[in-house]
Amino acid sequence: MATESTATAAIAAELVSADKVEDAPAPSTSADKMESLDVDSEAKKLLGLGQKHLVMGDIPAAVNAFQEAASLLGKKYGETANECGEAFFFYGKSLLELARMENGVLGNALEGVHVEEEEGEKTEDESLVENNDNVDEEAREELREQVYDAMGEKEAKKAEGQSLTKPETDKEQESEVEKGGREDMDISEPAEKLQEKVESTSKQLTESSEEAKEAAIPGLNEDEVTSGKTEQESLCTEEGKSISGVYVQNKEFREAVPQEEGEEMISLEKKPKETSEDQTIGAPEKQDTLMKVVEIEAEIDSEVKSVDVGGEEPKDQGAISESELGKAVLMQLSGQDVEVSPVVAAEAGSEVSEKPGQEITVLPNNGPVVGQSSAGDQTPSEPQNSAERLSETKDGASVEEVKAELVPEQEEAMPPVEESEAAGDGVETKVAQRATEKAPEDKFKIAANEETQERDEQMKEGEETEGSEEEDKENDKAEETTNESVLEKKTLQENEEEEIGNLELAWDMLDLAKIIFKRQETKEAQLYAAQAHLKLGEVSVESENYIQAVEEFQACLSLQEQYLEAHDRLLAETHYQLGLAYGYNSQYDEAVAQFGKSIDVIEKRMAVLLEQMKEAEGSFTEYEKEIEELKELLPEIREKIEDAKESQRSGNVAELALKATLVESSTSGFTPSGAGASVSMIASRKPTDGASSSNCVTDISHLVRKKRKPEEESPRKDDAKKAKPEPEVNGGSGDAVSSGNEVSENMEAEAENQAESQTTAEGTVDSAATVKSTAC
């Protein structure tokens, strides 16, 4: 059942589809016909418009019109269709004219280009530039103010960025301070809370001072320490000072707190100075010595601080040496009245060594606060300046300056140690000496470590920067090469596109039109083919391919002779173009012949027109106009004939001159011909004038003798040796020796004559000339 149902469903579907197909209307061809008619009519309109532009001299517009017509017909009928031949022919003809216009140096090459508009745009641009130059003074001042404001904002931003930047050591110190919980105090809190916090911090200081006292000097009493601390606190409270435990850096704190509150920063370096001053008020006799000690101690503290900021390991050693040194000096000089100062120094040294760069701020209750009390302000300004100078070295001075300042300060610190040795306190002085000896060594080690670390960092940064620079250079080179390759490809493509110029495109279009027209047997098509050959010849002339041009003109002439009369002007044009091609190809005889044939055709045409004028009735304006045109052509053609004849003559003369120069260059062997002539002259003169020639030879022999003396001596000796034994061999006696000597002399004279004759025969032209002069 299922199969039957599916089969019935399929049959029903087929029937429905068949009904639909039958009901569907048949496609109408009216739309296609309308489109074809529209294309043909549009192409004809474009062809007419192009011919109009061509006659009017608007070559670019004609090219566009013919191109559009050819594209329309080519899409509809195909490129090789008969309907496209005329469009391709005119398109190629217009392209040829456009190429001539572009290649013409003296022609109107700018025709069709809107030069006036470009000049107007240039004048507008120039006017804009002049307006910028003619700006008012007020506007200039406003611009200057804006520029200065922008520059000031940039400088302010730079200053803020520099102030906010911190070194790594300061960041580490701040982290340690935050861990210790000493930055909990707020500046905006009231004075009572600040005093409470000051009391708590003072208690902590007392506890730390007691511990330091027990560790450093077990013999001191706790009452003295506490009394010294209470006195210090009372002095601070009486003067209205509140010491905060906030430890911040100078620059950061000055930025955070406004200057209107009038606060001052008092560093830990001045703390032992204040305590020593307050405690030495009752002892005026030892004030000077104590001030020197305090100055030395403050300088050492600041130096330790400036050195400990860079390094981390030797902090404890610097603190111990500092505390012991202060303890020993103050115990020996000030006695029991100043026993608290070493403890304070120890506290200050320990705190400085543990947390360098931290300071104690003094906040007023009502108004600004002075750094020290008026009653106890007895210290001179020099220690303060020195301390401030050394504290400044902590921020920006180099390690070398600190080293230079350590040496005189150590020398100043040595006399109190020597006095302590004289007093008998040997143990403490030895400890102080060891501390003072170890401290500078540690400081120098720290400085050396800092220098090495800085150098390593600089080297690493330099290597990284060099590596990055090299990578950047390589990347830049790779990008440049890729860009250059892309540009080269683009330029090659553009050059290839540009190489397909108007002449080549015109050749293609005309060749295609020639093929289309030659395929047709009608007279009109064959004449179009002849015109295509003519234009192809002109394209060849423009591209300086004269042989191809001659072939194309001959093909055109053969077709025209078949279908045209003998007096047709097209024949005259073809003969003229063929004569030009022969002339360009240096075939002047053929050129003159073709120009003559062109004149004959024109004369025939004029005769025919005159006959038609006689036979015709009515106006003769058309005939007269054409006759005038033909008469104007004749002088030009005759001038071409004269030019061809003259060029033929000049060409013959040039050929003769060239042949003459070639012959002269080939036959002008200067040295061989001159030598031969001189030798012949010498040979002819020798038999006639023997005496003079012999005299001349003797004159030259003196010269040759001087030049070739070592070469001529050996043959003379050999000849003499050979001549001497001859009489003895022949059985001669002693008288024969004299005769042999005479014979040898004669032999030598003959040998000399032979050598001189050989030299004269083998001499150059110059030697021959000298022979002639000496002989005369």
From Swiss-Prot:
Nuclear localization signal, short sequence motif: residues: 704-710
Assembly description: Binds to linker H1 histones. Interacts with histones H2A, H2B, H3 and H4. Interacts with histone H3.3. Interacts with histones H3 and H4; NASP is a histone chaperone that stabilizes and maintains a soluble pool of istone H3-H4 dimers. Interacts with ASF1A and ASF1B; the interaction is probably indirect and mediated by H3-H4. Also binds to HSP90 in the cytoplasm. This interaction stimulates binding of NASP to H1-6/H1T.
Protein name according to UniProt: Nuclear autoantigenic sperm protein
An example Gene Ontology molecular-function term: histone chaperone activity
Protein family according to the UniProt entry: Belongs to the NASP family.
TPR repeat ranges per the UniProt record: 43-76, 530-563, 572-605
Cross-link Glycyl lysine isopeptide (Lys-Gly) (interchain with G-Cter in SUMO1): residue positions: K724
Native source species: Rattus norvegicus (Rat)
Function, as annotated: Component of the histone chaperone network. Binds and stabilizes histone H3-H4 not bound to chromatin to maintain a soluble reservoir and modulate degradation by chaperone-mediated autophagy. Required for DNA replication, normal cell cycle progression and cell proliferation. Forms a cytoplasmic complex with HSP90 and H1 linker histones and stimulates HSP90 ATPase activity. NASP and H1 histone are subsequently released from the complex and translocate to the nucleus where the histone is released for binding to DNA.
Record SUPFAM superfamilies: TPR-like
Residues modified as N-acetylalanine: A2
Region (Histone-binding): 116-127, 210-242, 457-500
Biological processes, Gene Ontology terms: blastocyst development; CENP-A containing chromatin assembly; DNA replication; DNA replication-dependent chromatin assembly; G1/S transition of mitotic cell cycle; male gonad development; nucleosome assembly; protein transport
Region (Disordered) residue spans: 115-241, 256-289, 345-497, 685-776
Chain positions found as N6-acetyllysine: K33, K241, K251, K286
Sections of the chain in a coiled coil: 599-647
Phosphothreonine: residues bearing it: T123, T169, T379, T452, T465, T482, T671
Cellular component GO terms, alphabetical: chromatin; cytoplasm; nucleoplasm; nucleus; protein-containing complex
